[in-house]
Amino acid sequence: MLHTIGILIWIIIKIIVIVVPLLISVAYLTYAERKVIGYIQVRIGPNRVGLKGLLQPFADLLKLITKEIIVPTRSNKYLFVIAPLFALVPSLVGWAVIPFQEGVVLANINAGVLYLFAMSSLGVYGVLIAGWASNSKYAMFGALRSTAQTVSYEIAMGFALVGVLLAAGSMNLTDIVNSQKGGMLHWWFIPLLPLFLVFWISGIAETNRAPFDLAEGESEIVAGFHVEYSGIGFALFFLSEYASMILISTVLAILFMGGWLSPFEGITFLDQIFFIVPGFVWLLLKISFFLFVYLWVRATFPRYRYDQLMRLGWKVLIPVTIVWLIVTAVMVVAHVKPWF
């Protein structure tokens, strides 16, 4: 009995250790986004609350918490209230299988990739329920767009994952990272470059970020699926979007960029200099790079038209992944060095 209680307490501690830094990261990702986009647009960005505006995320949180929650008169009130949780929970529970370093993982399951793919697919239900329950044409349009977009890009994303599974020979995320040992030239992003790019683009579309933010489409359908939300409901949708961004960036780093592995493995003089850097620091640096590109893309590219979005998913990304899956299978059978 005491042993079981001890295990439960340990699991709860690990969950807290993962979730609390994640929520803080989400808060400061919003700050980083406003600063980066401000710099790109030759503006200052938030700089009033705290030193250099560093307390701005907490001011935003306080504002959203204290706002009134308005439930539309003819909406389905029960579904309207719980929809943000349907969107948020999948973006948090996906972290259960993420290895931050060798052995540092909440649940080291052998089907980690499959679990992650399943969790990333569930977020769209929150968007769809929110759009339908709001009883608003703008919200419903946004929800339908998001559903079609997710279905389209998940196929390409799934095929890209199959390429990694072929190359690494495992669905365990720790094994996938360990299969990339030997330095930067052994990472999967080199032999699987088209799949890496497809997964990256699909990840941006999956999180409804610009230039694939048709589910929100401020200039077309006001704010899309969350047009009727205010206060904490809006904050939860906001939180789920940014948590999903961090999760997709982490998965990219693990599957294609060596996870916590140093890029200087095998280069003796550099390895001797950087061997003191812990593995999770390398992982954080890679995640930060992908997040910066998320922000850079938002500030740079205009929104796609809906037909362009569908055409890109079905006529470009899916054919590319199918072709490169065949190429990957040939490389695996032929044992192309140094990767296979």
UniProtKB/Swiss-Prot annotation:
Membrane topology per the record? Answer: Multi-pass membrane protein
Q: Where in the cell is it found?
A: Cell inner membrane
MF terms from GO for this chain are: NADH dehydrogenase activity; oxidoreductase activity, acting on NAD(P)H, quinone or similar compound as acceptor; quinone binding
Q: Where is the chain membrane-spanning?
A: 4-24, 78-98, 113-133, 151-171, 184-204, 244-264, 273-293, 316-336
UniProt lists the family membership as follows: Belongs to the complex I subunit 1 family.
What this chain does, per the entry, is described as: NDH-1 shuttles electrons from NADH, via FMN and iron-sulfur (Fe-S) centers, to quinones in the respiratory chain. The immediate electron acceptor for the enzyme in this species is believed to be ubiquinone. Couples the redox reaction to proton translocation (for every two electrons transferred, four hydrogen ions are translocated across the cytoplasmic membrane), and thus conserves the redox energy in a proton gradient. This subunit may bind ubiquinone.
Which PANTHER family would you find in this protein's record? Answer: NADH DEHYDROGENASE SUBUNIT 1, NADH-UBIQUINONE OXIDOREDUCTASE CHAIN 1
Protein name as catalogued: NADH-quinone oxidoreductase subunit H
What gene is this protein translated from?
Answer: nuoH
